[in-house]
A protein has these predicted regions:
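Positively charged, low-complexity/disordered segments
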Residues: 1-7
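The feature marks non-catalytic terminal segments
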Residues: 190-266
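Catalytic subdomain that performs nucleotidyl-dependent activation
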Residues: 59, 136-217, 221
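Residues that form or immediately flank small-molecule/cofactor binding pockets and catalytic motifs
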Residues: 66, 92-94, 174, 197, ...
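Residues that recognize and position ribonucleotide moieties
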Residues: 3, 110, 174
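Short, basic, helix/turn surface patches
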Residues: 111-124, 158-164, 218-239
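Conserved short-loop catalytic and cofactor-binding motifs
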Residues: 30, 64, 105, 169, ...
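ATP-dependent adenylation/nucleotidyltransferase module used to activate substrates
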Residues: 8-9, 13-152, 156, 160, ...
Length: 266
């Protein structure tokens, strides 16, 4: 596994972590493993990072079982063993809690999972949780916000928790492409779960492309745009780094909306 990790490990260490100052001396980071390819690679990269890094920090590898069926739980445990990841598994009943909710169960599930991860990580003395979102997640989120939410925003590389004082969320794979993660998975002949909730209990073998979600639609839109403009992904990513407030009609800061008219005649 380590042979195919070298290139990606340099990416996580020298790009996202340094660019956005994600890891600092003395940090104790809870690396959150969902069981998918992204979080598993992130866990391996943190092992490499800790081994080669110039300053000291600590990591804990966490797997939250929100109610996986036996097959999915087994896949996660086997992958952790095969990859040499000393993961701590803790239980929750999130799947049961959201199972009967008709409106936006996935959104609620994600929020609850993050809250449980923050809480358990804090109990372990961690000051940060690391999630496995990657570059493609970021650009898809930008477009989803524009096309379906009427807003310009991005998935941040790090942010302070609003509910757990002293805790931060970091995304070390922020600059890693999904195709590179898939290449690592395929090179090593690995198999991971995808979404494994009670709504999609067959997801040890399912294909995410069958899920006609908004994110899949956006992914397909980007792929089509890339056929015409090979730079479209980078341009979407950079667009939220180049916002000129002098050329927007309005913007929000700290929940307050500001209009260009506020200072138009000054």
């Amino acid at each position: 596994v380590s042979e195919c990790l070298v290139g990606s490990e340099m990416c996580i260490r020298d790009r996202a972590i340094n660019t956005y100052e994600l890891v600092k001396p003395g940090d104790k980071i809870a690396v959150c493993i969902s069981g998918g390819k992204d979080s598993m690679l992130m866990a391996k990269l943190f092992q490499e990072l800790k081994h080669h890094n110039k300053f000291d920090f600590d990591v804990k590898f966490l797997v939250m079982d929100p109610g996986y069926n036996e097959a999915n739980r087994h896949v996660i445990e086997e992958n952790c063993r095969n990859l040499g990841i000393p993961a701590t598994i803790f239980e929750s009943d999130i799947f049961d809690a959201v199972y009967d909710i008709e409106k936006s169960p996935c959104y609620l599930c994600a929020r609850m999972r993050r809250g449980h991860l923050y809480a358990f990580a804090k109990e372990l003395g961690c000051n940060k949780i690391a999630l496995g979102h990657h570059y493609d997640d970021v650009i898809e989120t930008i477009l989803m916000g524009m096309l379906y939410g009427a807003q310009v925003q991005t998935m941040m590389p790090k942010l302070h928790s609003t509910n757990f004082e002293g805790m931060e969320l970091i995304r070390p794979l922020y600059l890693v492409r999904e195709d590179d993660i898939k290449a690592w998975r395929d090179y090593n002949g690995l198999h991971f779960i995808q979404c494994a909730c009670k709504f999609t209990d067959t997801c040890t073998t399912c294909n995410n492309e069958e899920n006609r979600s908004k994110r899949v639609e956006i992914k397909q839109l980007i792929a089509n745009l890339k056929k015409v403009n090979p730079f479209v992904e980078a341009n979407i990513f950079k667009s939220v780094e180049n916002v000129n407030l002098a050329t927007v009609v309005a913007y929000k800061k700290d929940g307050i909306k500001h209009s260009f008219l506020d200072h138009y005649d000054e």
